[in-house]
Design a protein with these regions (language model features):
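Forkhead-associated
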Residues: 65-156
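Intrinsically disordered, low-complexity acidic Ser/Thr-rich regulatory segments
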Residues: 1-99, 113-114, 160-168
Length: 168
């Protein structure tokens, strides 16, 4: 293995460790308590398709309808504003360093699948959109239909994690 590869692997490892520290610091609630709160919230939802943010930077419920929903982040202080407008903003932890979430990262669509699925497309993001927990990167050229219980993340660390929830 050459030095450049070793350095790149070390940087990636350090970046992942920082993300894990962010997750434990920003998400101190006991996991059993969090599961109970999430279950209670899901019980109050109307019938339909939802994508639920589970990470520390994306803790919301997104209702999936017939119009596409674009996921991404705002430009950092070091970037020019982006022309594309996202519908759902993920607050990436890194304000000045490399960001895991692209400004236009992925698109969710409810009209391209059956009534119990959600179509997920990666918008050629720099860090990819990943199916979890199998860590399979979604091909930007091939939209993927997700069903109830499927999870995906924006970026490979799994910090910006989302769950597909279908309530009948």
């Amino acid at each position: 293995m050459n030095t450049d590869t070793e350095v790149a692997m070390l940087i990636q490892s350090l970046r992942f460790q920082c993300r894990l520290r962010d997750l434990s610091f920003l998400n101190p609630a006991d996991s059993d308590e969090k599961v109970a709160r999430i279950s209670a919230s899901l019980g109050r939802l109307a019938a339909g398709r939802y994508v639920i943010g589970l990470g520390p930077y994306c803790g919301e419920v997104i209702k999936i309808g017939s119009h596409p929903i674009r996921l991404g982040r705002h430009a950092s202080l070091l970037e020019e504003p982006h022309e594309e407008v996202v519908d759902y903003v993920v607050n990436d932890a890194s304000l000045l360093g490399p960001c895991e979430v692209s400004r236009l990262h992925a698109t969710l669509n409810g009209s391209d699948c059956d009534k119990e699925s959600v179509m997920l497309s990666d918008e050629t993001s720099s860090t990819g959109t990943w199916l979890q927990p199998q860590m399979q990167r979604i091909d930007p050229e091939t939209p993927t239909c997700l069903s109830h219980g499927d999870m995906f993340s924006l970026g490979g660390s799994g910090t910006n994690l989302f769950l597909v929830f279908v309530k009948k």
